[in-house]
């Protein structure tokens, strides 16, 4: 029994030594992948539209002005501002079309061609577009 216990200890010690050598070898354990922050999606009946890197739809508010959001307080609860910096964009999108503004509530928000971008709180899954056309002022963003 004592020999079995010593063998288990030896195996554990060797395991720790080997894992320490592998981790300290300077070689990455997993390769880092740059996440795309913005991409183009397509949906039947909707066409092409912008989404975040996870496929969540992005919207624009027709009452906004270039580089100025008018969706504040309660509005921003239902339509959370989208923000990513830097805006890593998918091939086919122009990085220069995206910028960041500081809102009146001091939060930062990403813009597309000057128009602030938003999520819709009732979109729960990638590809949901439930906010499109709400109040005739909210629309998906088309590239």
Please provide the spans of the model-predicted regions.
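Bacterial N-terminal signal peptides that target proteins for export
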Residues: 2-12
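Compact beta-sheet-dominated domain cores in extracellular/mature segments
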Residues: 26-143
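A subset of signal/propeptide-processing and intrinsically disordered low-complexity segments
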Residues: 1-2, 47
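Short, low-complexity, intrinsically disordered N-terminal modules
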Residues: 4, 22, 26-29
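Bacterial N-terminal signal peptides
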Residues: 11-21
